[in-house]
Amino acid sequence: LGLRIDWWAPFRKNKGAVKLHTQFDIKTEIHSFVHLSDGLHHDINFLDQVSLEKKAFYIMDKAYISFKRFSRIHDAGAFFVTRLQTNQDYRRIYSNPVDKTTGIMCDQVIRMNNFYPSKFYPDYLRRIKYRDVVGEKRLEFLTNNFELSALEIAALYKYRWRIELFFKWIKQHLKIKS
């Protein structure tokens, strides 16, 4: 966007950038919280604005990974599901049995090894490796939920794509370049 339009969101010398962060309620299929920010601030700062609900699931992409914020979600009695970054170092504590015909390749209890992740989130986490049988895409999930099945966690993450479709719709109708 040009600076004449979004002067409040500078990004480069002659260009502005706006980030739209949303919280999407899966049950009602309504965006329950929307936050605009300039393009200079990191995406994870959005999590500080969210009022957390007990037993709610917060499903997010890798840009929102912050173990300090995950701890806040966990302490609120809520759950998160995200994709595991490839550079994350963890230690496997236990492997749950899986049926690989469902697409679940592994379901593990892990603990983070790196200093800051283990400092901010010392509790156990769950790592789920999933292969989408339709698209052959391989995904690794990280969650603090140990109650749902691994397949249910993978299905929850698929709901995140509804937000991506919303952003695609906005870009098409407002003629915004990314």
Which stretches of residues belong to each language-model region?
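Single, function-defining residue in the core of a domain
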Residues: 3, 7, 11-178
